[in-house]
């Protein structure tokens, strides 16, 4: 029961052996159901599976997933700043599919062999959990691949660990020859405090288009008031509210489902 800012946070660590927890101190006391393990994660619910979005069938090897023409996704790492309890990749075999683990070469080789790929998504895990020097190593190796026009980062770190968006990182972004897109992940207006807003605006100043994706979660943001407040706060931070996803039916997350009539 961590004591954070004078608040006792009750977490069910001993209920489910699969209930790993990782969460920065600044957010551990906020909306605990999204961060802390719950016994409901061990419930077996029909229709909830390990791979709800078909990632395994899309594996091209070396951490590359390709589902669509002209676009590839790179599993840069399995690491995240938080373990979101509803993550659709919570059962993904990161030990087998992480491009950073082989120093990028195999993934670069695959991307070089398909000149139809114009957009590269950096995902994971969270690409910003890698150091800027590691990301710079990747961008250096991508330079000869002139068919790649856009880099798209899917990241939660600017929301939960805004200090990651530092001067070294934004200087590197500004130096890149790509159209840059950041898809950040905030679900509730309370996540967008002053430091987070500053980090999001810094991404925009570095030349990135910044979008937000949210997941509709029972007990977290399942009201029109919550969603409207989130959109307003995102606009104030220079971020376009872009996606609102229904819950992906991943095993262990059924308690977050919002019924759609």
What are these regions (language model features)?
Residues 94-96, 124-125, 153:
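Surface-exposed cleft-lining segments at the edges of enzyme active sites
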Residues 14, 27, 72, 80-83, ...:
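Generic hydrophobic, aliphatic-rich segments that mediate packing or membrane embedding
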Residues 87-99:
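Iron-sulfur (Fe-S) cluster-binding segments and ferredoxin-like electron-carrier domains
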Residues 57-87:
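N-terminal pre-triad scaffold of radical SAM enzymes
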Residues 13, 259-261:
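Short, intrinsically disordered, charge-balanced linker/junction segments flanking boundaries
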Residues 105-119, 128-259:
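Conserved AdoMet/S-adenosylmethionine-binding subsite of the radical SAM
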Residues 1-66:
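Flexible, acidic/Gly-rich N-terminal and inter-domain linker regions that tether
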Residues 74-75, 87, 119-122, 127-128:
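Conserved catalytic-core segments centered on acid/base and nucleophilic motifs
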């Amino acid at each position: 029961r961590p004591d954070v800012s004078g608040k006792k946070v009750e977490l069910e660590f001993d209920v489910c052996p699969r209930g790993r927890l990782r969460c920065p101190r600044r957010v551990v006391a906020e909306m605990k159901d999204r961060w802390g393990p719950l016994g409901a994660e061990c419930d077996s619910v029909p229709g909830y599976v390990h791979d709800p979005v078909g990632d395994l069938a899309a594996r091209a090897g070396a951490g590359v997933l390709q589902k669509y023409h002209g676009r590839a996704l790179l599993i840069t790492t399995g690491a995240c700043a938080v373990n979101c309890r509803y993550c659709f990749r919570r059962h993904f075999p990161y030990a087998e599919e992480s491009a950073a683990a082989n120093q990028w070469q195999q993934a670069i080789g695959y991307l070089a062999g398909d000149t139809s790929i114009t957009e590269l998504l950096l995902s994971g895990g969270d690409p910003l959990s890698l150091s800027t020097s590691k990301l710079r190593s990747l961008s250096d190796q991508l330079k000869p691949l002139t068919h790649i026009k856009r880099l798209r980062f899917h990241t939660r770190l600017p929301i939960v660990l805004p200090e990651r968006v530092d001067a070294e990182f934004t200087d590197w972004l500004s130096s890149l020859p790509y159209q840059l897109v950041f898809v950040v992940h905030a679900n509730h207006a309370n996540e967008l405090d002053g430091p987070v807003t500053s980090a999001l605006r810094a991404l925009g100043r570095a030349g990135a288009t910044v979008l937000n994706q949210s997941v509709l979660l029972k007990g977290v943001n399942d009201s029109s008031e919550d969603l409207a407040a989130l959109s307003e706060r995102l606009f104030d931070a220079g971020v376009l509210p872009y996606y609102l996803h229904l819950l992906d039916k991943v095993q262990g997350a059924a308690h977050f489902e919002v019924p759609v009539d």
